[in-house]
Amino acid sequence: MKEIHINILAVCLISVVLLSACSVTKHLPEGEVLYTGSKTVILNKSTTPVGETALTEIDAALDKTPSTKMFGGILPIPFKMWMYNDFVKYKKGFGKWMFNRFAANPPVFISTVNPEVRVKVTTNLLRDYGYFNGKVAYETVVDKKDSLKAGIIYTVDMKNPYFIDTVYYQRFTPQTLRIMERGRRMSYISPGEQFNVVDLDEERSRISTLLRNLGYFYFRPDYMTYQADTTLVPGGHISLRLIPVPGLPAAAQRPYYVGDASVYLFGKNGEAPNDSMMYKNLNIHYYNKLQVRPNMLYRWLNYQQFVRNAQMRASNRTRLYSQYRQEQIQEKLSQLGIFSYMDIQYAPKDTTAVCDTLDITMQATFAKPLDAELELNVVTKSNDQTGPGASFGVTRNNVFGGGESWNVKLKGSYEWQTGGGEKSSLMNSWEMGISTSLTFPRVVFPRWGKREFDFPATTTFRLYIDQLNRARYYKLLSFGGNATYDFQPTRTSRHSITPFKLTFNVLQHQSKEFMEIAADNPALYVSLDNQFIPAMEYTYTYDNASVRRVKNPIWWQSTVTSAGNVTATIYRAFGKPYNEEGKKLLGAPFSQFMKFNTEFRHLWNMDKNNKIASRVALGALFAYGNATIAPYSEQFYVGGANSIRAFTVRSIGPGGYHPKDSKYSYLDQTGTFRFEANVEYRFRIFKSIWG
């Protein structure tokens, strides 16, 4: 059999060699030369960050895959040219299908590569990145064995780049100049930096955004242009002047204020409004019945509701038009999920030359009130447990007319032992549960709830009940609920506060086998026994990945959980000692512990193809007072999808655990202290595929 495989391989290799020897130029049009590829020679290569970006752009401008390569140039086999030569003569039938399938694109000729145009484009790229003295040339190299085939050699001499010496803002109105000068510290172009048009365009966009956030509604980046002078400071330096374009419209040179607002709410099937009402300065037009509370519409559209500073709310400045606020309004309304279509327009209140007020017009179509979701999955675990699962959820949107959503979700799963042990064919584990949650798109809390955050904020109330059956071991009933406030005061910081979190676990049934295991491991039994866990939790997250110009982002999250302390304090007020164990609530002892968990991640982008990701995590769990052992569900483990992904749960580190034939292998092994760190080298394999 081995000899047969070797012979087949030899035949294939010989066939490839013979096919490669076949001429690929026998059907070329008269006067055309087949393009075989290109090579780029870089002289005086720049090593600056801007230079590396320029080289990437240059490679893209000069690159052209020849017809003499297979699969986009991965293999040096003229497959497409064979197809073209053999099937170009067919007009129908199988031959035409083969041509259309494998050789429909015409061969690449030197004339279609247009090396002259590519040289001009590359020269302009050098100018764009500050290489004003750079030169680009090309040479056509004819194949010595076949004069109808030729390649191209490009020579790029980058020479020395130019750097920015000074940047001036000139010829704008005094008020505009004051705003521009105040924002100069955030400029994308500064003295000493290498000249490049990308930063120049970003600077125009930055200034335009700055002005539009201060009322300049009609201002645009195209209303500014640069003047550059390379003679003032010799030695490769440029003096820049940013000036307004000739004929700058008068409307773009003054701030505007926000006036009245009108809202047109269409029915879910597009029915036009047939009724209206006034709420303060908000004119609401709606179809049949108003499905949104007027005060919520006013809150979302009124600028003063977005300002959390009392002095700013009292000043007239809050009425200034702001591009940032406009984007926030559109984002908030979109996140509600109650509209299938939405459009917001700003227009002058009148046509007079002195008009400085913009009225808002909003048009929106209501979405269908119900959403349904079905999920199916199959799970295979390392302890030979396998089985399917499913969940079905229904969400009712805009329950109280303020963007609230009510969700009900059912879930179920079962597993069976797939190993060859006793009773392995029986379905021996199952789980079912139901949960419901009510989510408000704002902070529902006295005083805090009167103001809006610039970024998403939600309040969630949740109740659930789950039944878990581990055949031959135990049956566990869990139910509870929580109230959680999530808000984001800045772009990089997020807070999650859970002032009330209740978990009640009832161990309904214990088998003889489970009791034997528990006798050998009392801590296991205590962690699974009836438990009442009243807890509070706070989580802070810092993430600067969305911040512009952050090259190496960091992510940090810390969580503090306190359980049973408020309950123990109440018992203490009624005469029960604080450190007395065994105190019960609703017939079950309540847990008392403190838990701290923190995790830090850093991503170092070495270049566009290589990254190093590092991660450090630390956690500690202390049980005291009414309980000496922390609940099983709150303990730590290392490995798995949410930890170090390359290892299964509890299979790495000094606490590694490998339950090969243990009768306890169905239980995850956990601990009360956690420390883990790992470093990953990530490299680009192909386009968006990383290793």
Question: What spans do the regions from the language model cover?
Answer:
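Bacterial N-terminal signal peptides that target proteins for export
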Residues: M1-L9
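Interaction-mediating elements
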Residues: K2-E3, S23-Q335, Y341-A347, T357
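C-terminal motif of bacterial Sec signal peptides marking the signal peptidase cleavage site
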Residues: L18-A21
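Strand-connecting loop/turn motifs
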Residues: Y131, Y216, P369, G401-G403, ...
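Amphipathic hydrophobic-ligand
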Residues: Y131-V136, F217-P221, T386-A390, M432-I434, ...
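Short small-residue beta-strand/loop micro-motif enriched in glycine and branched aliphatics
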Residues: I164-D165, F306-N309, L370-L374, Q417-G419, ...
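Gram-negative/organellar outer-membrane beta-barrel architecture
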Residues: T176-I179, L290-Q291, Y321-Q557, R645-P659
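C-terminal outer-membrane beta-barrel translocator/porin domains of Gram-negative envelope proteins
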Residues: Y279-Y287, V379-N383, S496-F686
